[in-house]
């Protein structure tokens, strides 16, 4: 039985499975197992996860890539939060890497994207510095030969991983301009 931290510990159905000794796994743990066998793009951040992961999945699908995606919201163009690729050939998996409950620490992406690290879920982290430290741990879990891409200005420049920054202000490795 797969569950998320959004399910309260006193939820009757969750407790039924606990009482009957069913095997329970957190969603993040299952995602970690699923993504081991594919090229994984994990997108984290307090803002922009769903938009960014949906866009990346759509780009891969539109390019004809074998893409599976676990998204945080229902996309308008697909009408679902789960896109399934096939089991043939190179597989790409896009995962919305949720920072709540430190769930993203179950992932070891080939490409990690961090969009923001604003104070959020302080009921879990206690204060902003502990939350930032969890993001830093997530960034360091990029697989050997992988890469971290993050918004310029985030406290990640000192990490010893292959990395690039992005911005719309001209102060990054990749810059958006209109």
Language-model features: locations:
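Phosphate-binding loop of NTP-binding sites
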Residues: 5-165
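Short, intrinsically disordered, charge-balanced linker/junction segments flanking boundaries
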Residues: 63, 171-178
């Amino acid at each position: 039985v797969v569950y998320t931290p959004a399910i309260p510990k006193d939820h009757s159905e969750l407790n039924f499975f606990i009482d009957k000794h069913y095997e329970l796994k957190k969603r993040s743990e299952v995602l970690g197992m699923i993504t081991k066998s594919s090229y994984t793009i994990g997108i984290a951040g307090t803002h922009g996860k769903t938009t960014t992961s949906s866009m990346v999945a759509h780009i891969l699908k539109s390019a004809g890539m074998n893409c599976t995606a676990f998204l945080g919201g229902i996309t308008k163009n697909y009408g679902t939060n789960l896109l399934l690729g096939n089991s043939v050939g190179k597989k790409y998996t896009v995962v919305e890497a949720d920072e709540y409950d430190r769930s993203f620490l179950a992932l070891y992406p080939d490409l990690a994207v961090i969009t923001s690290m604003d104070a959020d879920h302080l009921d879990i982290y206690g204060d902003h510095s502990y939350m930032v430290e969890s993001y830093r741990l997530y960034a360091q879990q990029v697989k050997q030969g992988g890469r971290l891409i993050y918004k310029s200005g985030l406290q990640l420049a000192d990490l010893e991983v292959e990395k690039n920054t992005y911005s719309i202000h001209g102060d990054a490795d990749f810059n958006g301009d209109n």
